[in-house]
Amino acid sequence: MTSYKELGLPPIINACGTVTRLGGAPMPSRVLDAFQEAAKEWVPLEQLQAAASRRIAATTGAEAGLVTAGSAAALTLGTAAMLVGQNLGHMEKLPQTDGFPNEIIIAREQRSGYDHAIRAAGARLVEVGFNEVTSNAGVRRVELWEFEVAITPQTAGIAYVHGPGSCPKLSEVVEMAHRHELPVIVDAAGELPPRENLKRIPDTEADLVAFSGGKAIR
C-alpha cells in the first residue's frame, strides 16, 4: 500500500476541519470495513441506488435520496433535473439548453467556485442582490423581492447556498418559489454537523438538498 510519505507529500496539521481540499474527513474503521465488504460482490447499481434512496428517505424525512460522487455531482445532477424534468428530448440535449427555460436565480453574495457545478449542467446563473458579504460594504443583504422580480419565462429554478447567516431565510425562498411553481436546489455541503440538519433543511420543503457525505456523516 502506498502511503502519502512514499509519494513525497509532507504531513500537515489540519486546523480547518472537514474541508474538501484536505480530503474531507478520515474514515472510521467501520466505514472502511463496509467498503471492503461491499467490494467483494457485484450488484445492479440501479437496485442499490433504489435501496439507498429508501434508507436516506427514512433517515432524513425527504421523499427520496440519491448517492452521488460528492456534493458537486449532486448539484449538477439536481440542476439537470430542474432543467429538463421528465422530458427525454431535453435530456438528450444537455448541456445544450437553448429552446427551454435554463436560468437559475442565485444571490450574488452566495456565488463561489463551486457553483460551476450548476453551470456544468447547462444552466445560466442569474445573480440578484449586491455582494455586500464579500465587499463588507455594510449596506444591506439580498432581499426576497429581488428573487421574485428576477423571475422570467426563462427561469428554471432557484439555487440557495445554506450556511450561517444565509439570507433571506431558506423557508421564505422556498415558499416564494413554489408560488411561482419553481423548484429550489440547496447547496448544504458544509452543513454537517450538526446531524439535525439532515432533517431540518429538507423540512423547509426545498426540492433538492445536497449534503457532503464525505465530511461528517457517520
Show which residues each predicted segment covers:
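Conserved PLP-enzyme active-site core in the AAT-like
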Residues: 2-22, 26, 53-67, 72-218
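A glycine-/small-polar-enriched, mobile loop at the entrance of the PLP active site in fold-type I
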Residues: 13-51
